[in-house]
Amino acid sequence: MMHLRRSVSAATDGPESNPRARTAFVLSCGGNQGVVQIGQLRALIERGIVPDVVIGCSAGALNGAALCYAPNLTGLDRLGAVWADLRTNDVFPGGKISRTWNVLRKSTHLFPNEGLAGVIERATPARSFADLAVPLRVVTADLDSGEEVVFCRGPLAPALLASAALPGVFPVIHHGGRRLVDGGVVDSVPLWHALSGPVDRVFVLNVSHTASDRPIRTPLDVVMASFAHSRNMRYELDRRLASEHVEIVELPRPEDQREIFDFGGGVELMEAAHHLCGDALDAYLDGDVLSTSEDHRAGRRLRIRFARRPVLRSSSAAPAA
């Protein structure tokens, strides 16, 4: 069932109680499902909900960079056009030939990252974090230590390439003596980083793969499902802890049964997400709630389900201190 989930502490008032609330957007990883975030962002911006800071990893970092450069509908139109035109070969150039060749020569990755670099260049004119109108934090992971490494200044492209460098699929990014890879490896929904500054509410755009996203058909499906369980447990823990400090609003998303290499159907998914989140946000802003659970003082989450449930047919960079 699609709904908007809102987690707050016992002392938090309703959404209209603080019209100048300091707002963070957290954009998860998600690969080809990153297209859903465009519809989610459009629903937010149309309702005057603009971020004071954005935190993203992998596909969410790319979308976050474009949003932070132009936090308006025009900027989202540009980003949406990039996603709508994306094809598998744009991101994974060479296809099976490239994969086979890299396996035979014992490469550490299956695909070069030139395709990703081209997508980044088309998605935003920004070349540096200094070009952004809204502060952005890009989450990556240190392959050797497992530490999260967060970028917030310097050249933008290396940070985005590192954040999307899925281990074994794309080459690692070497920076400052570290080998950096996709931030989703350790933190698929980098919620906790939103609390490093003065923030009152956090909108979470979580489009990361879950274990139930698609049937288990191949060995890769088994690996992805197991990986998803581990990452989701991290997010649930972070969400429970963070909701003691800020209001957390998790946006719904449409169902997406595409394979991970399939970039078709982007326009339909953007439209479905826009409609779904628009209805949920209207209900959130109106305070139109259906039910409320126990408060957080008992260590439980507060969940609000909204009465209006839409029916959808989904067809040199320096790390932050």
List PLM regions with ranges.
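Patatin-like phospholipase
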Residues: M1-C57, A65-A321
